[in-house]
Regions:
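Short pre-active-site segment immediately N-terminal to the catalytic Zn-binding motif
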Residues: 113-129
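Short, Lys/Arg-enriched, Gly/Pro-containing loop segments at transmembrane-helix junctions
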Residues: 66-69, 184-190
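Active-site-proximal gating segments in proteases and membrane effectors
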Residues: 82-111, 174, 188-241
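Catalytic Zn2+-binding segment of zinc metalloproteases
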Residues: 135-151, 195
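Active-site recognition of the HExxH zinc-binding catalytic motif
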Residues: 114, 129-142, 184-185
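Hydrophobic or amphipathic, alpha-helical segments that drive membrane association/targeting
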Residues: 1-95, 140-141, 153-163, 167-179, ...
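Short, membrane-interfacial amphipathic segments enriched in basic
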Residues: 124-128, 142, 220
């Protein structure tokens, strides 16, 4: 029996919390001087972030362990990839969840994961846009950018103990994430054409319709609502707040 995705995510989340807690405890235990404990835990936090981002390919394999053996779907994926001027290694996983994502802190270790559930609900044109979007994340080092921001935030938080800093840092991080999504959409449009990327976004919006209230909560969202991403491609106007 293979556990469901939600169960694997629960186990993985608990494991991550245990590792983070263990690193913080170890840092505090190794440094006897109370004045140096905060800095030691800051270093431990950065080590944790490095391990978390670097180990993302392994975590993706844990969350989606079954590589698809559907030959027709694999052939279709290969055919679409051949239409892309460039692409990362793409792995097709047998799962009903409709998803595609990129993991790996460095371009050399990055992997793109696509589920059979997504492929069954998008056209070849839409799939081409989605894959180009994920490839742009790799080429422009978006995961490395978010990792660098997280490290910078940890360092600043060590120097400035403020609730306002926490709130500002969180909002800034979410804004950065939304900006990088717009960048990936624009990069995909340059790579395979605007129509392919718009098609991909429209098909994703059909799968996951955006709620009417999402616009008002965008400040704390990691992804802009899909209609806004489509409009940004069509007009060139990116709305971050």
């Amino acid at each position: 029996m293979i556990p469901s995705t939600w169960f694997r995510r629960l186990i993985f989340g608990l494991f991550i919390l245990e590792v983070a807690g263990a690193l913080m405890w170890l840092a505090a235990w190794l440094v006897p001087n109370p004045a140096d404990k905060a800095f030691a835990q800051t270093v431990a936090g950065m080590v944790f972030l490095l391990g978390f981002y670097s180990g993302a390919p392994l975590s993706a394999r844990f969350l989606a362990p079954r590589e698809s053996d559907d030959q027709a779907m694999r052939n279709r994926l290969v055919r679409v990839l051949r239409e892309l001027p460039r692409s990362r290694p793409v792995f097709l996983y047998d799962h009903d969840e409709k998803n595609a994502n990129t993991v790996g802190i460095l371009a050399s270790q990055s992997r793109v994961y696509v589920t059979t559930g997504l492929m069954a609900h998008v056209s070849d044109e839409g799939l081409k846009g989605i894959l180009a979007h994920e490839d742009t994340h790799v080429v422009e080092h978006h995961i490395l950018v978010t990792f660098s921001y997280a490290c910078a935030y940890v360092l600043v938080a060590n120097e400035v103990n403020s609730n306002h800093l926490f709130i500002f840092g969180f909002i800034a991080f979410m804004t950065l994430r939304r900006y990088l999504e717009y960048r990936a959409d624009a990069g995909a449009a340059k790579l395979v054409g605007k129509e392919a990327m718009v098609t991909g976004l429209k098909e994703l919006n059909a799968i996951y319709p955006s709620k009417s209230w999402a616009r008002w909560f965008m400040t704390v969202m990691a992804y802009p609502p899909l209609p806004m991403r489509i409009k940004a491609l069509e007009t060139g106007r990116k709305v971050l707040f």
